[in-house]
C-alpha cells in the first residue's frame, strides 16, 4: 500500500510538472508580469506572477488550451501556444519572436518557426508589392514582380499544407488549417465553354467556408482567427445584410455547435451582442430572436442554454421580450384602437386600408 501511494504521488507530481509554463526573458528587470489569453479576438488577463532574474513560472493547469502570451511592462508582449504540456521558452528584446528559443514544447516547436516563417515571407512580399505599386501594369518589371509575389505565396501555402499534413492532432496544425483559405474549383461549363452558373464560385465558397475548422476542438476559439472568420462570415462580403438572412444562418450555425462548448458561448454571445448594438434599422430583430432562442428559453433541467450568463442577468435580458418581438420588421404589430381627430369615432389600426400611412403636419 505504501508503495502504491508513493507511485501515485510521483505520478501526480509528474502531471503537475508537465503543465508548468516556464519563460525566460534576458535582461528583464524583476517585475510583475502577466499571462494573457485570447477569447475570440479579445485579450484577457489569465494569471499574475513575479519575474525574478528574467524568469517566471505559471501554472498551466489553470489555463485552457489556445494562444496565450506574456505581457511585460511597457505594453510589450509575445505569444505562444499552450496545450496542456510543459513549456520552456527563452527570448530577449526588442524582437521577442525573432529571438525566441523553444527549449521544451512540442506545440511551440511548430508554432514559433511557423510565425517566424510567415513574418519573413510577409516582409518579402510587402517589399515587392511596394516596388510594383510604383510601376504601371504595362511595364515589363510589373509582371516579373507579380510572378515573384505569387511564388512567395505558393511557398507559404506549401509550408502550411506540410505542417497540417505532417502533424495530425496537434493544436498548431488545426490553428494553421483554420487560417487557410478554401480552394474553389473551376466553375462547370457547357460544351461551348459557357459558365453553367455565374455564381458558382460564391456558392461553393459560402457552402465550404467552415471546412477547415475543427469544431470539435474547443481550443480554436481561444485565438483571434476564429473570431475574424465568424465576423467575415456574417459580414456584407459574404451575406446579405438583411435581418431574416442573418437569423437564418445564425440559427443554423449556432445549433450545429456543441451547446456546452466555449465555441458555442463565443458565437452565440458575439452574434447577439453585435446585432444588439447595430445602428442598422431592423437588426434589432436578430438580437431579440437570439435572446429568445439561446438565452430566454429553458432546457429539460430548467436552465438557459446561455450557461455563461449569471442568473441575475436573465431578468433584464428577457423582460417583456415577447412584446418586443412583436415590434420588429416583418411582424404584424399589436392592434391599436384610438379615437380619431374628431374625438367621436374609434378607429383600429388593422382596419386601415392604405398601403402606407402618412402623417402630415
Question: Across the structure, where does each feature detected by a protein language model lie?
Answer:
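Non-catalytic accessory segments flanking enzyme active sites
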Residues: 282-328
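Amphipathic alpha-helical repeat scaffolds of TPR domains
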Residues: 170-178, 227-228, 264-270
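Conserved small/polar residues in nucleotide/adenosyl-binding loops
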Residues: 361
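A non-transmembrane, solvent-exposed segment enriched in polar/low-complexity residues
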Residues: 19-168, 175-210, 216
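A recognition module on extended beta-rich or small alphabeta surfaces enriched in W/G with H and D/E
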Residues: 194-243
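Bacterial Sec-dependent N-terminal signal peptides
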Residues: 1-24
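A cross-family structural signal marking well-folded subdomains
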Residues: 243-302
Amino acid at each position: 500500500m505504501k508503495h502504491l501511494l508513493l507511485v501515485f504521488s510521483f505520478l501526480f507530481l509528474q502531471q503537475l510538472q508537465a503543465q508548468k509554463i516556464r519563460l525566460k526573458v534576458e535582461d528583464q528587470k524583476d517585475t510583475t508580469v502577466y499571462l494573457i489569453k485570447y477569447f475570440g479576438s479579445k485579450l484577457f488577463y489569465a494569471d499574475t506572477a513575479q519575474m525574478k532574474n528574467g524568469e517566471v513560472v505559471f501554472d498551466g493547469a489553470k489555463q485552457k488550451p489556445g494562444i496565450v502570451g506574456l505581457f511585460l511592462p511597457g505594453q510589450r508582449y509575445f505569444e505562444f501556444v499552450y496545450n496542456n504540456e510543459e513549456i520552456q521558452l527563452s527570448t530577449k528584446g526588442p524582437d521577442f519572436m525573432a529571438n525566441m528559443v523553444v527549449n521544451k514544447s512540442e506545440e511551440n516547436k511548430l508554432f514559433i518557426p511557423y510565425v517566424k516563417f510567415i513574418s519573413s515571407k510577409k516582409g518579402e512580399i510587402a517589399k515587392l508589392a511596394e516596388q510594383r505599386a510604383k510601376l504601371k501594369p504595362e511595364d515589363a518589371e510589373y509582371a516579373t514582380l507579380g510572378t515573384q509575389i505569387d511564388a512567395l505565396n505558393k511557398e507559404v501555402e506549401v509550408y502550411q499544407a506540410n505542417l497540417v499534413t505532417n502533424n495530425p492532432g496537434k493544436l498548431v496544425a488545426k490553428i494553421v488549417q483554420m487560417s487557410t483559405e478554401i480552394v474553389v474549383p473551376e466553375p462547370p461549363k457547357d460544351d461551348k465553354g459557357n459558365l453553367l452558373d455565374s455564381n458558382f464560385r460564391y456558392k461553393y465558397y459560402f457552402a465550404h467556408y467552415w471546412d477547415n475548422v475543427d469544431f470539435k476542438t474547443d481550443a480554436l476559439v481561444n485565438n483571434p482567427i476564429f473570431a475574424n472568420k465568424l465576423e467575415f462570415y456574417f459580414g456584407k462580403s459574404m451575406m446579405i445584410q438583411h435581418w431574416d438572412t442573418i437569423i437564418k444562418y445564425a440559427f443554423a450555425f449556432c445549433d450545429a455547435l456543441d451547446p456546452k462548448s466555449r465555441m458555442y458561448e463565443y458565437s452565440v454571445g458575439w452574434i447577439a451582442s453585435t446585432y444588439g448594438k447595430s445602428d442598422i434599422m431592423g437588426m434589432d430583430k436578430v438580437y431579440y430572436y437570439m435572446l429568445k432562442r439561446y438565452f430566454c428559453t429553458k432546457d429539460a433541467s430548467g436552465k438557459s442554454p446561455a450557461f455563461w450568463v449569471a442568473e441575475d442577468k436573465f431578468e433584464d435580458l428577457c423582460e417583456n421580450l415577447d412584446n418586443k418581438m412583436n415590434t420588429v420588421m416583418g411582424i404584424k404589430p399589436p392592434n391599436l384602437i384610438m379615437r380619431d381627430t374628431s374625438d367621436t369615432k374609434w378607429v383600429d389600426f388593422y382596419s386601415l386600408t392604405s398601403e402606407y400611412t402618412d402623417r402630415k403636419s
